[in-house]
């Protein structure tokens, strides 16, 4: 996982005596050949299952437990076309691997999957749980805790579906985005059913150093389909239980689960279980990146595959093009309707105007030949003239409205035509890319094997910290002051004991802690695969 420069020019026998039965020196060539041999054997998955048994029996052994699942993206620097994830670096979307980790409730990474960079976490959520339980040999997972990336109705229904075939129910616990709920839709359950949430329903949740309340929490029920039902005639419901955490600035965090209401202890415990993601998983990623080189890639062997990314872009462009064509067709229908309305208005105006002019002409004739009551005829003439002016004004107003609609539709037509041309260009581009550009996937076997070693190192560090130091030292202190500490290897005659004698420490506190750790280590009587007893001591 690291290549210290000391190993490149290492000429002594100590490292060889520990790592190889022959006692020969171990350099880069030895370690590289070993890794290549492991890769050629295709033992990554079998290795993961075997190590999982060890971790589970050592750290857990529970009949049931919650697990934390999240993805970690590792960027790959290559000129080849390989799958890309939703991760940017140096002003571009990076290709890489998506590694999905399953961690236990105490933070130990137990199992992982190495996938192409375009793999979404939702596609690996249930498969990695299934692999975990198959390796353990029984149903042990009762809760899967993930971030908001996996919060969807489809995921909740997937968990409901698999519970039909399980003896132990398994539930999903995740965070909801702010656009997935309305505050008014959060309901409190009482004896009479459901009622709106009130400020008095919240109880104190977190306190600051001065014992002042930082946040409040309450348990509510929420219809996940409430947003969709606003636009539907036939309404359906899907109820989830939510822990609502409110901060001082009234910002809400809504944590949702499909666990039945009767099985949820309280909103506080539900929130605690979700927020435990940070120490159990997010902090472990940070730790492993620093001490286990989690971000380092291993193995760049590629194989050519179907260009699914170009195919995805092509289908998206074709869908957009078809949508624009439908929009244009609908718009042209509206445009034709407006044109027809304008022609009808014009014809009707001419007809009405001609009718009024004929009436005025007849009135003028009657006035000229003094037929009928002259006052009535003049009043009627004035009325018809007034109607003619009103008719023209009304016509001009209606024509103005129709012309404004015509102008707006013409503007939209130009925009849609531009979009159609743009989508046609995109379709041609991605069709050419699909036909002519090779697409590769990186063989993940070597990286998968090395990730097993990285998980092994992380769990070994956690085991060392908790077993030999009772969890009283931080990981940084453990690495710098104890694991990387210098000393000598003393081998008595016969070679049946390896005694590691560590140099003195600077402070009495560190020396005392290390001597206590050496005492526990020696009492465990740890032996190598060859039967050699390992002992540790601090020089006086």
Residue ranges and their predicted role:
Residues 116-184:
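Domain-level cores of phosphate- or acyl-group-handling catalytic modules
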Residues 11-102:
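Active-site-proximal, Lys/Arg-enriched surface segment
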Residues 1, 7-10, 14-15, 27, ...:
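Short, conserved catalytic/metal-binding motifs centered on acidic residues
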Residues 164-280, 405, 502, 516, ...:
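An anionic, glycine-rich sequence signature occurring as long contiguous blocks
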Residues 267-299:
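Short amphipathic alpha-helical "interface-anchor" segments enriched in bulky aromatics
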Residues 89-137, 249-256:
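Electropositive, glycine- and tryptophan-enriched low-complexity nucleic-acid-binding patches
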Residues 198-205, 209-213, 315-540:
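A short, flexible helix-boundary coil/loop motif
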Residues 1-33, 63, 73, 361, ...:
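Extended, highly charged clamp/arch subdomains and adjacent linkers
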